[in-house]
């Protein structure tokens, strides 16, 4: 008898067998109730008796087919952390849990399919080795970016590094609070300036967070709010003599809608701005265009520190006389790309007197923040992880999607020892393989191509019982596209000959990164106990 006493039902119709059309119908009903892909409540496929199908049970193998890291931590903890106490987990004794990439150093002892290449000699490391003090400040939506990603994948603060995490609002849609926690972030940045930190790295999350919503008015209000707080920070920084770099990690907010009037809710390939302010030499600077990797060498130059050989980025102000060792503020306006100067750009539409004044009075450059410039595939929109990692590393760091794509193209994905072992163990044990993956073809968090590849591997190995647990994106996909994508996937499963889609839920539920474990519990309970909205053939 297996866990929970649930017996898999024998079904004959392909639509029931594969599950995609059934879940798609349930999602359409939830759309009518106002739910969206991003925040979709957990859905569970059930048999004719209302019993959940394909739950994760002891002895099974699980592959978490998402990449990147910070959003996958909470759900992974619930499955593998023996000290987990945020809610009562099942208490697996014999579950093989494979992660696609290393989400956090705490998971280093788990089977990792594509282990990371550590980035050494980052901006933060050089500053720390010089005995200087540094401060990282962000609200929780972007905290991992100014710490883990900016530090090249290092979770631990360096000597002399202080990290400040401000909680983002919870329990309310972000477009209803476009200010987020910006006042508190601003206050901590200004406090750091007054405290005299040698390097301050801060993130204003609003542009990216609001850029992912469909609320045009909130996007415009967001731009105005960021502008006002930008003024406070710049005034404090220049007053204290800080060399100040204002830039972005990627584009998003600058595009409000597509040409056909549909709301634009995803990252862009646009360049991002760089304003470089030196209060000792205002406006006396030749600034060149470049890439995000040029940020770290430029900051080190102002700090009076030598740039390591590993940093291949160039100086953005190569001939500027800094006049000795300076203090530096790097302020990242998340998602604040360079867009058209018309009504499709919330930044243009909003009252932004501070931004307008800075771009008129100070040197201004364009930095490439997408595609190959940040280690992504050519033509791929930028993202916060790649942006911050490349800024901190001072060199192009190949991102997980490129490494995984290379593995898919050269065939090494299909021979990955960790993945092959998971399939073989499920087969030898006569248990099930579970694939938790993102229902997207272009998200920076993952691709449906990975579960499909694993299904082909399982089919070739003779493993028949494979279940898919899908996370709807709502960011890289068009709003309302979930049912169509599920039906397309169902057809692909039919061609492969194995696989059943047994659960689905929104990215905002399954991949929370704000410490809201009530969301994580909803995802976990659906995956393990079958708790969620039941979906059955009609």
Segments (PLM) and residue ranges:
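Feature captures the catalytic ectodomains and active-site-proximal regions of enzymes
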Residues: 1-538
């Amino acid at each position: 008898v297996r866990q929970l006493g649930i017996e898999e039902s024998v079904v004959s119709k392909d639509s029931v067998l594969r599950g995609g059309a059934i879940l798609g119908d349930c999602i359409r009903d939830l759309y009518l109730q106002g739910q969206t892909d991003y925040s979709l409540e957990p859905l569970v496929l059930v048999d004719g008796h209302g019993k959940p199908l394909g739950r994760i049970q002891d002895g099974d193998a699980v592959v978490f087919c998402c990449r990147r890291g910070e959003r996958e931590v909470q759900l992974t903890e619930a499955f593998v952390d023996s000290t987990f106490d945020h809610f009562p987990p099942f208490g697996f004794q014999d579950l093989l849990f494979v992660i696609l990439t290393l989400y956090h150093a705490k998971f280093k002892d788990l089977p990792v399919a594509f282990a990371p290449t550590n980035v050494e000699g980052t901006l933060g490391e050089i500053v720390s080795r010089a005995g200087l003090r540094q401060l990282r400040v962000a609200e929780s939506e972007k905290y991992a970016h100014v710490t883990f990603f900016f530090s090249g994948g290092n979770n631990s603060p360096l000597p002399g590094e202080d990290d400040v995490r401000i909680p983002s609002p919870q329990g309310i849609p972000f477009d209803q609070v476009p200010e987020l926690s910006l006042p508190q972030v601003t206050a901590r940045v200004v406090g750091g300036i007054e405290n005299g930190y040698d390097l301050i790295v801060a993130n204003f999350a609003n542009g990216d967070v609001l850029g992912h919503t469909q609320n045009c008015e909130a996007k415009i209000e967001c731009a105005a709010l960021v502008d006002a707080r930008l003024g406070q920070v710049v005034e404090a920084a220049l007053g204290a003599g800080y060399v100040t770099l204002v830039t972005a990690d990627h584009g998003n907010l600058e595009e409000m809608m597509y040409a056909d009037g549909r709301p634009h809710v995803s990252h862009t390939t646009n360049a991002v701005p760089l304003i470089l302010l030196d209060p000792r030499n205002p406006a006396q600077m030749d600034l060149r265009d470049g890439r995000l990797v040029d940020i770290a060498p430029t900051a080190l130059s102002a700090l009076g520190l030598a740039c390591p050989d590993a940093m291949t980025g160039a100086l953005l102000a190569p001939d500027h006389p800094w006049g000795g060792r300076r203090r530096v503020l790097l302020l990242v306006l998340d998602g604040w790309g360079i867009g058209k100067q018309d009504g499709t750009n919330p930044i243009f539409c909003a009252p932004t007197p501070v931004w307008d004044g800075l771009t008129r009075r100070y040197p201004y450059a364009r930095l490439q923040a997408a595609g190959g410039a940040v280690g992504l595939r050519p033509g791929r929109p930028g993202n916060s992880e790649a942006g911050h990692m490349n800024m901190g590393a001072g060199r192009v760091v190949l991102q997980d999607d490129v490494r995984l794509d290379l593995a898919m193209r050269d065939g090494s994905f299909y021979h990955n020892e960790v993945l092959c072992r998971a399939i073989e163990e499920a087969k030898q044990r006569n248990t099930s393989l579970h694939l938790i993956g993102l229902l997207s073809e272009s998200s920076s968090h993952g691709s449906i191509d990975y579960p499909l590849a694993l299904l082909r591997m399982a089919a070739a190995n003779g493993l028949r019982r494979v279940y898919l647990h899908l996370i709807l994106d709502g960011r890289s996909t068009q709003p309302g596209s979930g049912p169509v994508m599920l039906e397309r996937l169902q057809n692909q499963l039919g061609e492969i000959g194995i696989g059943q889609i047994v659960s689905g839920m929104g990215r905002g539920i399954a991949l929370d990164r704000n410490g809201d474990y009530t969301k994580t519990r909803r995802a976990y309970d659906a995956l393990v106990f079958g708790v969620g909205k039941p979906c059955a053939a009609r």
